Design a protein with these regions (language model features):
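Conserved beta-strand-loop-alpha-helix hinge in the C-terminal portion
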Residues: 185-209
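Helix-to-loop junction immediately C-terminal to a conserved catalytic motif
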Residues: 21
Length: 236
């Protein structure tokens, strides 16, 4: 499933991801990933075929002169055989439609292209859980739509996605559940429809504008479809 956490600046959303990924340690309490205490994982055990994390700035995951070199370096670290290396890279690149970007310098890519290339790199880890920190930051509407379709595809492949974001429209489009992070606590978790329709502040523009006519519409597409069904050309 895709789970989105929303909340104000300083609420602790990014800190939560860093604790789950093992980057930071909690001051108190415990973290379990796949039923195992985080402290019990040794070396790279947590990050191979279990958990991967994509930071807010996708540029930070790239270390080499081309996207391909970055992918090759990571695949080798993971123990990928030389005979399987190119097939593995091509499989990821084709899935994300970035084959034409493999020989480009990561910093020469657009924001949306960098985001997809960065996701490609973490997918080489074959994660069951993918953490995403503000994945739509700095990308245009078209790239955002492509990213949304990609996240839905990954969900269909059995990958769980935990995303923190300020982008309520994107969360409404792609999430199975949404939660509110307030004062370092998750105060509510519900379906996108229940979460946004019962919230006056953290809700979508579509819901805010249309809620007097359509109680459960949270995306522009839903409002447009309801208007068509009811023969209304506009909402007053």
């Amino acid at each position: 499933e895709v789970v989105s956490l929303l909340g104000g600046n300083g609420a602790g959303k990014t800190t939560l991801l860093s604790v789950i990924s093992g980057t930071n340690r909690p001051y108190y309490g415990k973290i379990e990933v796949f039923g195992k205490r985080l402290q019990k994982y040794r070396g790279k055990e947590l990050y191979i075929r279990k958990l991967a994390s994509l930071p807010q700035n996708p540029q930070t995951v790239f270390l080499k002169m081309t996207v391909r070199e970055d992918y090759e370096e990571l695949a080798k670290v993971l123990g990928c055989k030389k005979s399987e290396l190119e097939d593995k890279i091509q499989a990821v690149a084709q899935q994300l439609e970035i084959t034409h970007l493999l020989d480009r310098h990561p910093y020469d890519l657009s924001g949306g292209e960098q985001q997809r290339a960065a996701i490609g790199k973490v997918l080489l880890l074959e994660p069951r859980l993918l953490l995403l920190d503000e994945p739509t930051k700095g990308i245009d509407a078209w790239s955002k739509r492509q990213l949304g379709n990609l996240l839905k595809d990954l969900r269909g492949q059995g990958i769980t996605l935990l995303m923190v974001t300020h982008d309520v429209e994107f969360a409404a489009e792609v999430s199975d559940r949404c939660g509110l992070f307030f004062d370092h606590e998750i105060t509510s978790v519900d379906t996108p429809e229940e979460f946004f329709c019962n919230n006056n502040y953290y809700t979508t523009a579509a819901n805010r504008i249309s809620r007097q006519q359509y109680e459960n519409a949270i995306t522009c597409e839903e409002v447009i479809e309801l208007c068509r069904q009811n023969g209304r050309k506009s909402i007053r």
